[in-house]
């Protein structure tokens, strides 16, 4: 019998999410500050799932500055489990945030897929592995919790030729919930999903005349802030 594996990757900016009603993570970001953080996983299926968790960097490479434990385990149906995040290095910046991705992957046990295929008369076994990834943000002790009314004063938007430039003068990773150019919502905003600390992003606005920017950010709990405005 042939076996195929399909992996679906999900990155979502909500307060919690369900990956195709397969498993649910109770948050969309982990803030690592002075205590060991954790996430709760719920198996919503009527059969067990194999759960594997890893930490990746922003370049989609496995990262060893943090580990997720347990790294792999079996979840019974209609059950919950906790994954803890442990920092394994002291070589992270102490004056600004660092970000990784916590990725959690689920797959039905092989025997479950085999029974389904036999029942349906198929000779191939297809296991669908679903991976959900959430932001893992390390916030050193010297960096206080963000106050967004203060942060907004240090986010600078300006035009430079065909580019709209966003400069982040804060020690925080700033994630955006929504962005408006004048009154038009930016639906394909992959270039401005988030901006790193003390960095800038350029957004190509060729053939557009923009006079005003409105935006909402995402707070530590995954909720949307109020809309802020900047005149260009």
Swiss-Prot record:
Q: Which UniProt keywords apply?
A: Chaperone, Fimbrium biogenesis, Immunoglobulin domain, Periplasm, Signal
> Where's it found, cell-wise?
Periplasm
> For this UniProt entry, which residues form the secretion signal?
1-20
SUPFAM superfamilies from the entry?
Answer: PapD-like, Periplasmic chaperone C-domain
What is this protein for, i.e. what is its function?
A: Involved in the biogenesis of the CS6 fimbria.
* Family stated for the protein in its record: Belongs to the periplasmic pilus chaperone family.
- PANTHER family, per database record: CHAPERONE PROTEIN CAF1M, PILUS ASSEMBLY CHAPERONE
Q: What is this protein called?
A: Chaperone protein CssC
Protein's organism = Escherichia coli
